[in-house]
Amino acid sequence: MFFIFPLFQTIGYSFTDYNGINPRKEFTGLTNYVDVFQDKWFYNSMLFTGKSVILMILLANVLGFLLALALNTKIKSRNILRAIVFCPFVFNNVTVGFIWQFLLGRFMTDLYPLTGWKVFNIGWLSDSSLVLYSVVFVKLWQSIGYFMVIYLAGLQLLPQDPLE
């Protein structure tokens, strides 16, 4: 119910000129959809989203599995390390976005005059050739703990004798 009603309401709104503020809604038919598919930025956005999803899925699975293998050992601090890796997953997406926007933007530019390191003078979020990797890195940082936990649960179900 909490999913179905808003879904159909949103689909209904997509056939009107409703802007969310003015209560007046006038039926526009498929005009909104025609406008979207004629917009040059729509295809760039879809391509960016597709690339980031593919990179994210591949890297999150590979790195999550490698972390699970590394933390499936009998080292003393494994539980603390597992918690540290999983912790970013519980953060809200908006919070993560603001934190990394500050770190990759303002914080980096403030560090450059102090250190002189060129890595701090790069526009991680403003350079069109780097923004994809910056976004994937941030999302990877946030979600890799989830993938690690899933793989770790699977690894712990395996019998230990063949693994040794």
Model-derived regions: residue spans:
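A structural signal for multi-pass alpha-helical bundles of membrane permease subunits
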Residues: 1-164
